[in-house]
Amino acid sequence: MLRCGLACERCRWILPLLLLSAIAFDIIALAGRGWLQSSNHIQTSSLWWRCFDEGGGSGSYDDGCQSLMEYAWGRAAAATLFCGFIILCICFILSFFALCGPQMLVFLRVIGGLLALAAIFQIISLVIYPVKYTQTFRLHDNPAVNYIYNWAYGFGWAATIILIGCSFFFCCLPNYEDDLLGAAKPRYFYPPA
C-alpha cells in the first residue's frame, strides 16, 4: 500500500529554519567586505567602506579606506538593510510562538506581512547601493576596469529572495490550519487499496 500524504505537522518547522538561514545570509551581507570588486583587484568595497588595497583593506581610515557613511545614500542603504534585518529577527522569534500552539496561528499572516516589509526594505537597500555607488564614483569612466558585485552582495539578495518566499508561505499557512495541527485526515494521491 503506497500512501503519500501531506505531513504539515512535521514540516512546519522548515519555515523558521529558512528564516534562520536568511538571518545568516543577512549577517554575511552586513559584515562582508565583498560587495564590489574591481577586475584588477585594486578596489574592494563593502556596505560600509571603499578600500584601495590589493587585499581589500581592513576597512579603516589607517589603510586609506573611505567610509561610505559620509554619503546620504550610503547611510540609507545601510539603514534600510539593517531595518530589514531587525524585522527579520523579530519575525524569526515570532514564528516559534506562532507555530507552537493553535491559538497563535492568527499571527502567521502578521509575520508574513512583516516579512514582506523586510523584503521591501532590503530590495530598496540592494538597489540604492549599486545605482548610487556607480553614479558617485563614476565607475563607467574607465572602460578598462570592470566592476563586479561580489559574494556579500549576492548573500543580501539570497536573504531577500528567502524573505519573499517565506512571506508568501506565512500568509498562506492559516488556510491549512487543520493540517498544521494534525487534525486533518491524510490526503492520498493514490486511492487506498
UniProtKB/Swiss-Prot annotation:
Keyword annotations: Apoptosis, Cell adhesion, Cell junction, Cell membrane, Cytoplasm, Membrane, Transmembrane, Transmembrane helix
Tissue specificity statement from the Swiss-Prot or TrEMBL entry: Expressed in the stratified squamous skin epithelium of the skin and the tongue, but not in simple epithelia (at protein level). Expressed in the oral epithelium, tongue epithelium and skin (at protein level). More abundant in areas of lower flow stress in the inner curvature compared to the outer curvature regions of the aorta (at protein level). Expressed in luminal cells and myoepithelium cells of the mammary epithelium (at protein level).
Expression induction or repression: Up-regulated by UV irradiation, doxorubicin (DOX) and Tp53 in embryonic fibroblasts.
Subcellular location: Cell junction, Desmosome; Cell membrane; Cytoplasm
A biological process from GO: tissue homeostasis
GO CC terms: cytoplasm; desmosome; Golgi apparatus; mitochondrion; plasma membrane
Membrane topology label: Multi-pass membrane protein
Record-linked InterPro entries: P53_induced, PMP22/EMP/MP20/Claudin
Entry keyword Membrane: yes
Disruption phenotype: Knockout mice exhibit postnatal lethality and defects in stratified epithelia. Decrease in expression of Dmkn, Krt83, Sost, Lama2 and the amelogenesis pathway proteins Ambn, Enam, Mmp20 and Klk4 in first lower molars at birth. Upper and lower first molars show defective enamel formation and architectural abnormalities suggesting impairment of enamel matrix secretion and mineralization at postnatal day 2 (P2).
DNA-binding is among the record's keywords: no
Principal subcellular localisation of the protein: other
Transmembrane portions of the chain: 12-32, 81-101, 110-130, 151-171
UniProt family annotation: Belongs to the TMEM47 family.
Misc note: May play a protective role in an experimental model of autoimmune encephalomyelitis that has similarities to human multiple sclerosis. Perp is protective against demyelination, inflammatory infiltrates in the spinal cord tissues and increased levels of pro-inflammatory markers Tnf, Il6 and Il17a in the brain. This is reflected in protection from early onset and decreased severity of experimental autoimmune encephalomyelitis.
Function summary: Component of intercellular desmosome junctions. Plays a role in stratified epithelial integrity and cell-cell adhesion by promoting desmosome assembly. Thereby plays a role in barrier function of the skin against infection. Plays a role in mammary epithelial tissue homeostasis and remodeling during and after pregnancy, potentially via its involvement in desmosome cell-cell junctions. Required for tooth enamel development via facilitating desmosome-mediated ameloblast adhesion to the stratum intermedium during the transitional stage of amelogenesis.
PANTHER family: P53 APOPTOSIS EFFECTOR RELATED TO PMP-22 (PTHR14399:SF4), P53-INDUCED PROTEIN RELATED (PTHR14399)
Protein name: p53 apoptosis effector related to PMP-22
Lineage of the organism: Eukaryota, Metazoa, Chordata, Craniata, Vertebrata
